[in-house]
């Protein structure tokens, strides 16, 4: 009997000890989906990670966009759609591989079993609290240690996007990549590839704020940076890159801690850009394209009269603003500002709020310099709407977070159309205020390149370093109202970085402050057709 009890105890103990470890592989293949539940995005993804040979294959939407990184050859091929055709470009230079597995498994805490996607899993977690913002991260493996799901409630570990809920599901995973060697064959389409200018690796750089001791010695800072890399799955391709990231990391900590230690109308909070240089941040979130010399606007809104308009406007109160959307890891901000203005002004004119398709603009509005996820302008969007007649609804032509083939020849239009569009007098905040009050939400371009804008959390943003020249504008947003908060005038601005950024997706931009950040430098709105 005692032997039986001892045997049973040993069996029980062996079961307790048989907890699979988090995977750590130098080579692997995975197939699954990358999901953003907030905006109902389910992006099929196929990825080969090969740190042994310093190369990588990434395909999304079943081959709609393919990136093959040959960092061992200082070259990258990208195959993707441009309006109705697939094209190939090649980009010289090195970069960092995208690893979807935790690089420091020992820093994760085991927290028991559960069921995910119908599979009994073993979960590991991290909880990271920084400047009032807490992120929760869970990595689930099956009994054999095979990844099942990476759940991120905070910053996107994988591709380095703003705080949100991200879910990476693994359908297939193997560390034997020999069967997938053909994936690294250069596509035939790339025989005539066009060379794109070299740019910073768009997948580099996540965030952290590990402590706020500005007097820390270099050794202490180095230890904090080590924790940062472990917590946020950071890998750098060389010692030189590591040293550069360390400098950026220390600078980000200083920016936030220094700002929040003083009196200010707004507060900052850490997010996923702390080890990025300004150039990298601009490339990742706000790609700039050549500005069109002619906008094609029908007229200019130059009415600066403030006598007969309300002292406060918020078009959400009239149900003329759709919920905050999420551009994800795509430089498509220009489409969200444009659809937001068309949605709002159509609502004011016709009394109906219709959520319109940003993806149709990404895929089809290849006009006057606009390049889908590579950036663009509201004027291009409105010119396209005039040309095509009407955009589809968001539900009929849903957002992909990715350039796609244009479907405007087959998709059902929404019926929302415009007769033209109007530019607001450049630099006139009173004209912008009048336009918002009398016509509805207005698409505006701002300078979002100042370091602290990416960390904005609350209050009236009024950093004097923010510029207002036309060539300084790098991010399209939507002005939906104005008012005064704690004695400071503001424009109420809707961003496209989900509700996890700022004040549930919104920011108070300083008003009557010398056109700070260029809020009125390039404001545009459409003229909806009256039903």
From Swiss-Prot:
Q: Enumerate the PROSITE patterns for this protein.
A: THIOL_PROTEASE_CYS, THIOL_PROTEASE_HIS
UniProt keywords, alphabetically: Disulfide bond, Glycoprotein, Secreted, Signal
Gene disruption phenotype: Cells proliferate more rapidly than wild type cells and exhibit supernumerary centrosomes and a cytokinesis defect. They also produce fewer spores at culmination. Form large fruiting bodies with large spore heads.
**What processes in GO biological process is this protein linked to?**
G protein-coupled chemorepellent receptor signaling pathway; immune response; negative regulation of asexual reproduction; positive regulation of apoptotic signaling pathway; protein localization to plasma membrane; proteolysis; sorocarp morphogenesis
Is rRNA processing found in the keyword set? no
Task: Return the CDD domains for the record.
Answer: Peptidase_C1A
Q: Which domain of life is it from?
A: Eukaryota
The SS bond pairs are 330-373, 364-406, 466-517
Briefly, what is this protein's role? Inhibitor that slows proliferation of secreting cells (also known as chalone). Requires aprA for activity.
The family this protein is said to belong to: Belongs to the peptidase C1 family.
Its main localization is: secreted
| Residues forming the catalytic site | 333, 475, 495
- Using the record for this protein, list the coiled-coil segments as residue ranges, or answer none: none
Q: Answer yes or no on keyword DNA-binding.
A: no
Q: Which residues form the signal peptide?
A: 1-18
Q: Which organism was this protein described from?
A: Dictyostelium discoideum (Social amoeba)
Q: How does it assemble?
A: Interacts with aprA.
The protein's name in its UniProt record = Counting factor associated protein D
List where in the cell it is found. Answer: Secreted
Q: According to the record, which residues are glycosylated?
A: 94, 111, 423
What is the gene called? cfaD
Gene Ontology, cellular component aspect: cytoplasmic vesicle; extracellular region; extracellular space; lysosome
InterPro entries given in the database record: Papain-like_cys_pep_sf (IPR038765), Pept_cys_AS (IPR000169), Pept_his_AS (IPR025660), Peptidase_C1A (IPR013128), Peptidase_C1A_C (IPR000668), Peptidase_C1A_papain-like (IPR039417), Prot_inhib_I29 (IPR013201)
